[in-house]
Amino acid sequence: MTHKRLFTEGSKMGKHVKYAIKCVTFVLLTGFLVGMVNTCLKPKYYYNQMWPSTNTYLDFYNLDKNSVDVLFLGSSHAMCTFNPQIIYDTYGITSYNLASEQQSLVVSYYWLREALKYQTPKVVVLDTYMLYKFGANYVYNDMNCSEGSVRKAMDGMRPSPLKWEAARTIAQIDPTQSALSYLFLNIRYHARWSNLNEDDFTESSMIEHGGVKGFTTTGGTAPGAVFTPFTTADAADAEAESMFGTSQIYLDKITALCADKGIRLILTNIPCDSSPERYKATKTYADAHGLPYYDFNEASLYSTIAYDAAENLLSHPNYLGAEKVSHYLGAVLAGEYGIAARADASYDKSRAVYTHAVANITLTQITDPCEYLNSLQNSAYTIFIFAPKAFSSCISEGLMNQLFTLGFSTELREIPDSYHYCAVNGPDGLTEQLTMEDISLSGSIRGGVTPYRFLIDTSVMVPEGHTFSLTVDSTECGTQAPGLNLVVYDSDTKSIVDRVNINTTDPALPLTRY
């Protein structure tokens, strides 16, 4: 009887174990599948976009632990101003930019807490733009930003009790939002099934590529822009503007957290046409809490960095404006805060990303045809040439040799105007056609991922019905302009970076963009 009882009890225990294993397996499998769905449905903003928040936050988790001495937080102003690459290359200081579009101080606070799980920064630099009401023409909640902006920052945070706390806080401040949807993203993004694209299935490779330590590289200028910075005397006579309620509450929390952790907190405001009223309010707060405040809208500081609103842009500086602010802060961090240089090989990778982004920007500013062709010697570029009409009469030997150097092989001098020429040359090889006949040529680049098509159809009797088309990844790039029409596709950013016409029927060889 004893053996029978033991056998029966053992059988029951075995059934319980099997049941437990099945339950655990089910939970793990369900969690894995939900995680996959969440990752797939989550909107992606990679290094090849204007505001690359996906790379910003997922790249952060790839950093070596305790490898960052300075953290930057703030809005899009901070994203395109504080350049960790420039600070490292100049001063050897390791830093990371955790800013995002319209970053609420609530989000800044929770991302600072998240960052402190992995890093032990000596200094935190906080952009103060979002301390004040973001705009008058927006339906604002107490987050002082849109839901989309909150999610761009919070979707990238790893699931944890802290993220759940942040989600509940956000939902309390803005009752239109669901706390649970910050952990289970499919609740918010289930409708994206019909809009999924390549980016939704290549997250691992895009994160492996990496960005520029959270910095976004932008170009552009504002010819004729005039900005008169205010003086400290202007601020002394001004009435301080009130901070946005929730923003001040969470500024207090950030200040207290930094003090508790022994971190030096620096307040900043980048060149953005800010007011002396805001300066006075922020400076009063900074002085009351023993914090340094650098407002680059104040005349002496604006002059010190030789900032120029027309050349460097306000609010969202181009990369040259960002370099000016970053050089200044780097000197402050090294000199006044004693942040020492240290070697970090990861900056070699981010330097390559930054250099390539700058090359793309400078390419779009070149107007000399010879200089332009010389700048196309980049292994990431695929060059499309579309010449549907007259193109040959003024092609010089020098220009032709530059085309040969780029890898094109067809002689284009002394070609009758009745000929058409199309070509594509890049990492996937060379394809060319020079013919009097109509053209229909299709192919793909990036290993078959990105399609293109040349189409010249003059079969209709009336010229108005003729077709002159070049499509690259569904973007129409065709034109009937005389000369050589060039489309530059960057395989690194997976995008068209420039389109120009070099009028090789004009001896002056004018270069224009279209």
Identify the meaning behind each predicted range.
Residues 1-19:
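N-terminal Lys/Arg-rich, disordered targeting/topogenic segments
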Residues 31-94, 104-114:
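Membrane/wall-proximal cationic-aromatic binding patches
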Residues 73, 77-161:
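Membrane-embedded segments
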Residues 102-106, 243-245, 271-278, 392:
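Acidic-and-aromatic substrate-binding clefts and catalytic sites of carbohydrate-active enzymes
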Residues 142-261, 341-357:
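Secreted/periplasmic serine-hydrolase-like ester/acetyl group-modifying domain
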Residues 254-275:
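Active-site segments of SGNH/GDSL-like serine hydrolases
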Residues 277-348:
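C-terminal regions of proteins
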Residues 360-382, 386-514:
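Short acidic-hydrophobic catalytic motif
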